[in-house]
Amino acid sequence: MAVKIKLQRVGKIRTPQYRVVVQDARARRGGAVIENLGIYQPANQPSIIDINSERAQYWIGVGAQPTDTALALLKLTGDWQKAKGLEGGENTVKPQPEKKSKLDIFNEALAEAAEGPTAEAITEKRRKAKEEAEAKAAAEAEAAEKAEAEAAEKAAAEAAEESEEASAE
């Protein structure tokens, strides 16, 4: 029986994902599978290529013929070179970048929220009303200080008068 290593399309529309499978050469693309070797997700950056190296080399050694795209993937992972005894059998697939855990993202957002908003979102009317309220509060504070100063002056003047009257007696 002629056996091929093919890509079997799975996934949604416009989101291609493939399984790297071993099938009978005459089987249709979505047909019966002898063995599933791995996955290929080209939509991710960088692409995800995860192929079981040991099983891929076994099937190549037994005589399974890869399709052109499957051959390109097997060359990237180095499985084709290892099975055929060629040089350059190292895996050249770029590793996926480390994702932040949800706990780290949550803690960063919590720390940012604790610092408070970085900019105020205030309309023009509210800004003017806020400035007027601050000016009014400042004017009231000044009036209160003047009243206290005048009361202190009166108290000092009365104390001076009492001391003069006491010394005159």
Swiss-Prot record:
Region of interest: Disordered: 114-169
Keyword set includes Nucleus: no
Any one Gene Ontology cellular component term annotated for this protein: small ribosomal subunit
Matches recorded under PANTHER family: 30S RIBOSOMAL PROTEIN S16 (PTHR12919), SMALL RIBOSOMAL SUBUNIT PROTEIN BS16M (PTHR12919:SF20)
Family matches, as NCBIfam families: PRK14520.1, S16
Family recorded in the similarity comment: Belongs to the bacterial ribosomal protein bS16 family.
Name the UniProt record assigns to this protein: Small ribosomal subunit protein bS16
Annotated source species: Corynebacterium urealyticum (strain ATCC 43042 / DSM 7109)
